[in-house]
Regions:
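Short, amphipathic alpha-helical "recognition" segments used to contact nucleic acids or chromatin
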Residues: 382-401, 466, 471
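Long, continuous compositionally biased terminal/linker segments
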Residues: 219-238, 335-374
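Intein-associated homing endonuclease modules of the LAGLIDADG/DOD-type, together
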Residues: 41, 61-88, 92-334, 457-489
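Hydrophobic N-terminal alpha-helices or hydrophobic patches in metabolic proteins across all domains
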Residues: 1-18, 490-506
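Long, charge-dense accessory insertions within large macromolecular proteins
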Residues: 19-60, 415-417, 438-452
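Basic, alpha-helical nucleic-acid-binding regions used in initiation and control of genome expression
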Residues: 370, 374-378, 382, 391, ...
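Short alpha-helical "recognition helix" segments of helix-turn-helix
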Residues: 402-410
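Major-groove recognition helix of helix-turn-helix-like DNA-binding domains
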Residues: 412-437
């Protein structure tokens, strides 16, 4: 099909290293999409690339091959991918074809998986009418930078969602200026988004601030950055960002929030969590506290604060993430209430939260979440394997297999086999006694600047033949994230021409 078809070198004899159709490719703004679904839209999309830092790149090539033999790789954390034997994976020794890898070898993965792409409902978020009382020069600037009218499908809107979420937590307005407070590396990321919108962010400022908590006084360096352009402030205000003292404000989530896709809601929430949610931390050697957000509101706007928390909980529920009931109680300050919302702390729920939503504009929390999610995945994978063995042992023992034979059959503690065979198990097994604590795992894990982590291959098995696909990216790193694995992109170089067949024949 010369109008709508895709380039398919595999169909004409090239040996293309490829991935199975359901392999999720990471896309910008926290999205993911099965590689086969990129066929008709790859030229309009960008793929996330694991360069020195994560970045995104245009996609220059999409390949589709006929059925080829594929193998399933599973890691010690339970992450899987299906690929042809010649597909290269990132390892400590560089890109290595799958056929050159074996159980126990190390590959690199990125723990964050994002949310499935959905095409947003298209509607006008802000129009020129919303600014009819503003200076005409301000309106002209916004129109010139394609910020008015602002549509729900605009890339600029995605950036504004992040800025609005973060500013609601750690921002302030001073006169016409918009201020953000964060660590320097996080302010740099905010500056990039502001610059992409056509505004000019300031340099990063620093000053020493003295604080007192529970009678203990300490000094810390506060970093900030401002945007003097009045247009950004007016846009953020109209997007629902509170003005003035937040404790006295009746702000809730924006009225259009429910019309957004999950991945768009996650942009706002993850930025707000980067500012306001507690960092991943453990309550015991292997179990985590529930990450939580807290707010103080004056009593007369406490209901608005509870509605804000309830909206967040509802949005997270739609992403498969469960929360604890909202807590609301008197704060120490007169006429002030404190509201608190936490993420349920069971391992599977935390994995979903850290890997689908997580934190934006906060590198330290993001780094901790990256290690935490891999630790929890490994822990859950070990527990699931132990539960499977316990079930098999109980069944075999009931069928008459001697326990001595079972202890020989399974590479696991004899006491575990005996208890499973004789007593059964009423609940899930615990991790084995030698399983590392999170602190030990954190210290031993080499987290790279792009937040990819090394993980061991647990198994590689042949799974049959199926159609396979690949991408070629424009970035010099020539890789992308597939089911979280850092894999090489298609190495074929192609030239497209407008010459017809008759032109070539002469």
């Amino acid at each position: 099909d010369t109008e709508d078809g895709c380039i398919s070198p595999g169909a004409v004899g090239y040996d293309i290293n490829c991935l199975s159709s359901e392999t999720n490719v990471r896309l910008p703004f926290g999205r993911r999409m099965p590689i086969a679904d990129l066929r008709d839209r790859f030229e309009d999309e960008r793929a996330v690339v694991a360069a020195e830092e994560l970045t995104d790149s245009g996609i220059r090539l999409f390949t589709e091959s006929g059925e080829r033999e594929v193998f399933e790789v599973q890691t010690e954390t339970g992450q899987t991918i299906r690929a042809t034997a010649d597909h290269p994976f990132s390892t400590p020794n560089g890109m290595t074809d799958l056929e050159g890898l074996a159980e126990g070898d190390t590959v690199f993965v990125h723990p964050f998986e994002g949310l499935s792409h959905e095409d947003p409902e298209e509607f006008t978020v802000l129009s020129e009418r919303d600014f009819e009382n503003e200076n005409p020069q301000l309106v002209a600037f916004l129109k010139r930078n394609d910020l008015l009218p602002l549509q729900s499908t605009d890339e600029a809107f995605n950036r504004l969602l992040k800025l609005a979420g973060f500013h609601t937590g750690d921002g302030a307005f001073r006169g016409k200026q918009t201020w953000f407070y964060a660590d320097p590396e996080d302010l740099s990321e905010i500056q990039d988004d502001i610059d992409a919108l056509g505004f000019s962010p300031s340099k990063v400022y620093s000053r020493e601030r003295t604080h007192e908590i529970d009678g203990n006084e300490f000094t810390r360096t506060e970093y900030s950055m401002k945007v003097s352009a009045h247009g950004l402030k007016q846009m953020l205000l109209r997007l629902g960002v509170p003005d003035g003292r937040k404790v006295e404000s009746d702000f809730t989530l924006p009225e259009w929030f429910d019309r957004l896709t999950d991945w768009q809601r996650a942009l706002y929430l993850s930025a707000f969590f980067g500012a306001e949610m507690s960092s991943p931390s453990t309550v015991s050697n292997t179990n985590f506290h529930c990450p939580k957000i807290s707010q103080n509101r004056r009593r007369n706007v406490g209901d608005a604060g509870e509605a804000f928390m309830a909206g967040i909980a509802e949005a997270l529920e739609g992403m498969g993430i469960r929360t604890n009931p909202i807590e609301r109680f008197d704060a120490e300050t007169d006429d002030t209430e404190r509201l608190r919302l936490g993420i349920k702390s069971d391992a599977e729920n935390l994995i979903r939260f850290f890997s689908r939503v997580g934190y934006r504009y906060n590198g330290e929390k993001r780094r901790k979440a990256a290690v935490a999610v891999q630790y929890l995945r490994r822990k859950e994978h070990v527990i699931e394997n132990r539960a499977r063995i316990a079930s098999e042992v109980e069944t075999l023992a009931d069928g008459g297999t001697p326990v001595s034979d079972l202890t020989e059959q399974y590479d696991i503690n004899d006491r575990f086999i005996e208890r499973s065979a004789w007593n059964g198990r009423s609940g899930r097994p615990r991790p084995p006694s030698g399983f590392p604590t999170f602190e030990e795992y954190d210290e031993a894990t080499e987290l790279r600047e792009n937040l990819t982590v090394p993980v061991e291959i647990e198994s590689i098995r042949e799974v049959g033949s199926e159609p396979v696909y690949d991408l070629g990216v424009e970035h010099d790193a020539h890789n992308f994230l597939a089911n979280g694995f850092v894999v090489s992109n298609c190495g074929v170089r192609m030239v497209r021409t407008n010459l017809t067949y008759d032109d070539v024949q002469g």
